[in-house]
Amino acid sequence: MCVFSSIICSTILSTSARESSEFLDNITNMQIAITSTSLLIIIIISYTLAQRKCTSTTLQDFSIWKYISAITLVGVVSYSIMNGVRAKVGNTPPGIAASGIDRTLWGTYVSVQAKAQLGDRIERLLSPKHLEGTTIKATFADPVDIVVILGETARADFLSAYGFKHSTTPVLDSLIAEGDAFCFNDARCAANSTIESSKRIFTLWNDRPGLEWCDFPNLMSCFSRAGYRTIWYTNQETEGPFSVERMFGKTVDLLRTPYGKSGGVVTRVGFDEEILPVIGKFNDSLQIRQPEKKSGQLSIIHLMGSHYQYSLRYPSKFNHFKKEDVIRKNGSTANAKVAEYMNSILYTDYVLGAIYALYRERPALIVYLSDHGESLYDSPDQPDLCGHGGRPTLEQADIPFVVMLTPSFRKSYPALSKRIYDSRFRPISTAWLTNTLTLTAGIRTRYSDDRYDFFGEKFNPPTQRTTQGEGGKALYPPVKIKRVK
């Protein structure tokens, strides 16, 4: 049972054409049958009442549509009260109790207010005051590429690079064997939803109490101050309250998508490989158009990754895994979805390899991480959950974090390359990424902290890693086993 709240309402208001299409594709025959049957029963009862001869003049004036409206309203209110009472006496968890009419109105109001406030937060994010006192002591003697690949909904334990029994990351496994890449053994996402996670990934906020994400320097503006070209490539929508690109798009020199002016909002978002020619085109043209920026280039690449609906994330030739290949059995339908998820990981691996190939002949430091993980019918508290959000779970918090260093980067900066490689068994949080990358490049703001620099020699975080979710933060113990090479 869904609880109507400001979160649900915000989702409805910000839903794009792509998401609407995927929602309709996911409606089951059983759901259609239940809805149709309920409507039919209401119509039959209303028609019967409308045909009856009543002594009451008021009831005689009732049309069938008035009966339908009245019965529906009574049903909704009664069901809401019933579930509220059941939740209060402990027969059902409060989280699945139906909401009242007051929450419907309040949730709508809150979501509309939140949408209006987003513009204000974006303006605050762009304030030049955030960078006051910033010092630059360049680490790199020559221009380099710093690349952050933001994946979607990938969990670490489904990658063969992290020990998964099936070969879901053959390209990455090969890069690791060749010495071009390595994985961090224990990385936690800062939040279990894309927007909340991105607020922490791309700023120096680090959940400082009493302040908001938009009151701190962001990764892109920091690198721009240091003389880097900045560009954001995306295979996701560029508009809407739930769009990362809407939040951070103004912080970069260029925002590019395969979908032109539509930005993927009205057109259907395709496979992640469609972004590859866009990356190649603008990587070369930026060097010509902005020759004054000598430090190099910061590129953010936002993939669709394993975003639900999984089967829409990869071409048919990547339909490799079947439900019989699923290790943890959960029934035919669930196993089929998990197999589709495995295929989406396999396809993302292919895309990562193709992106690396675009930068391989240049000095580049490339980081791939996921915004959050995914529950796949394996959450102890919610065994039927396939998705993310709400209360955090370990499956949603445990994400892959991969570093790829090109041969020319390793040759030019051997000590730094070794230091980054040696840090792969540190327990890290994606909330510390902006702090780490800026300090690595020699960019120091008044909010920088060497203790949170997980590539650095002084790494010693004074706070524990947490994953933000609905209702608060969750804390999970470090990974105790060695999962990566």
Residue ranges and their predicted role:
Residues 1-97:
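Transmembrane and membrane-interface helices of multi-pass
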Residues 48-51, 74, 79-81, 221, ...:
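Membrane-interface soluble catalytic domains
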Residues 78-148, 153-328, 398, 429-430, ...:
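Active-site-proximal alpha/beta segments of enzymes that process anionic O-linked groups
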Residues 133, 277-287, 324-368, 424, ...:
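A long, amphipathic alpha-helix that forms part
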Residues 159, 356, 378:
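Active-site-flanking alpha-helical
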Residues 163-167, 364, 369-414, 450:
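Histidine-centered active-site microenvironments of extracellular/periplasmic hydrolases
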Residues 206-210, 263-267, 334-345, 349, ...:
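Active-site rim elements
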Residues 317-335, 408-417:
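Flexible internal linker/loop segments at domain or repeat junctions
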